[in-house]
UniProtKB/Swiss-Prot annotation:
It comes from Staphylococcus aureus (strain MRSA252). The keyword Amino-acid biosynthesis applies. It comes from the Bacteria. This is Tryptophan synthase beta chain. It catalyses: (1S,2R)-1-C-(indol-3-yl)glycerol 3-phosphate + L-serine = D-glyceraldehyde 3-phosphate + L-tryptophan + H2O. The lineage of its organism: Bacteria, Bacillati, Bacillota, Bacilli, Bacillales.
Length: 404
């Protein structure tokens, strides 16, 4: 394994050619303040202790690493272990980062938070920590996502957040990020931008990765305990890339195959997909340089996925870099493949995963049978499917997939 991999951003916030701080001058003081505060917090054992306390006592970590016996047997290949991020308080991996950033904001003396959300999971996690630490929160959410995720909108409001519908563009996650950044520019003195994925201007990709890498650290110690060795392959779904980078990061320098699974939507050959790596090219969006779905003229294209959490047109800078150097292999799953995997997995394991996570499972179903029974795959179940019940119900009804 190549030990020359760059695992931290350079002084200018780049991983290879990706990353940076493409923001208006008015935001630079806030970015500089955040970078300094984060560096201090990271080095402060007291901050780390407080974070660990809340992760354990409030979130319920460590999450289990569960051997999927029935699923493994049905696929007839590698042993499959599930990293159960669906068992966190609020039902997904998003809380790991929301909690860390809220503690950081509190340390910086910020009384208010602003966040964007797609599926609503990051919004719910942000509203949860805002309630916990008595902070105000404004959440920007695309109007299209609000329609898809009514239950999460109500959750956020019940928790005390103000949810603002974004009608611009496609009314999805990308548009919500634009609005959240604009809001932050004009409320920068008392507000922290609680960015939910491993993207945005430096230091956000690093901050989000560090708070999410608790996933990979736990996997490492748990699999060593259970199997006495590291896994052969690790699989995670990828939108902006926070659950995947958190899963992969502690294994970057190990001899472990890493697979990120993008959303192919209605198919690679259509224009309705979210394949930033698969069909995209490097460009700048939301303050960072990364792989983007864009046309020849550099216009960012609309992303599509049945999963509200994966329909983002970019993929974070660290993932973009790992793709270029060949450290992470990017695969994809279409809406249909993901939904079929979700239904199959649920029947075998009695666990209903989020549609996002089902994209990773779809690739596991292709990968596992090609491996031997001694091989080990770990797949991150990034969230639970409660929020997706209506989408799953509609999908099955439209296709006459009776629940027999």
């Amino acid at each position: 394994m190549n030990k020359q991999i760059q695992t931290e951003a350079d002084e200018l916030g780049f991983f290879g050619e990706y990353g940076g701080q493409y923001v208006p001058e008015t935001l630079m003081p806030a970015i500089i303040e955040l970078k300094k505060a984060y560096k201090e917090a990271k080095a402060d054992p007291e901050f780390q202790r407080e974070l660990e306390y809340y992760l354990s006592e409030y979130v319920g970590r460590a999450t289990p690493l569960t051997y999927a016996a029935s699923y493994t047997e049905s696929l007839g290949g590698a042993k499959i272990y599930l990293k159960r991020e669906d068992l966190n308080h609020t039902g997904a991996h998003k809380i790991n980062n929301a909690l860390g950033q809220a503690l950081l904001a509190k340390r910086m003396g910020k009384k208010k938070l602003v966040a964007e959300t797609g599926a609503g999971q990051h919004g719910v996690a942000s509203a949860t920590v805002a309630a916990l630490f008595d902070m105000e929160l404004v959440v920007f959410m695309g109007s299209e996502d609000i329609k898809r995720q009514q239950l999460n909108v109500f959750r956020m409001e019940l928790l005390g957040a103000k949810v603002v519908a974004v009608e611009d563009g496609q009314g999805t996650l990308s548009d919500a990020v634009n609005k959240a950044l604009q809001y932050w520019v004009s409320h920068v003195d008392d507000t922290h931008y609680l960015l939910g994925s491993a993207l945005g201007p430096d230091p956000f990709p690093t901050i989000v990765r560090d708070f999410q890498s608790v996933i990979g650290k736990e996997i490492k110690s748990q699999i060593l305990k259970k199997e006495g060795r590291l896994p052969d392959a690790i699989v995670a779904c990828i939108g902006g890339g926070s659950n995947a980078i958190g899963t992969f990061y502690p294994f970057i320098k190990d001899d472990v195959a890493l697979y990120g699974v993008e959303a192919a939507g209605q198919g690679e050959d259509t224009d309705k997909h979210a394949l930033a790596i698969g069909k995209g090219s490097p460009g700048v969006l939301h303050g960072t340089k990364m792989y983007l779905i864009q046309d020849e003229g550099g216009q960012v294209q609309l992303a599509h996925s049945i999963s509200a959490g994966l329909d983002y047109p970019g993929i974070g800078p660290e993932h973009s870099y790992y793709h270029d150097i060949g450290r992470v292999t990017f695969e994809n799953a279409s809406d249909t493949q993901a939904m079929n995997a979700l239904i199959n997995f649920t029947k075998h394991e009695g666990i209903i995963p989020a549609i996002e996570s089902a994209h990773a499972l779809s690739y596991v179903e292709r990968l596992a049978p090609t491996m031997s029974k001694e091989d080990i795959i770990v797949v991150t179940i990034s969230g639970r499917g409660d929020k997706d019940m209506e989408t799953i119900r509609q999908y099955m009804a439209e296709r006459g997939l009776a629940n027999d």
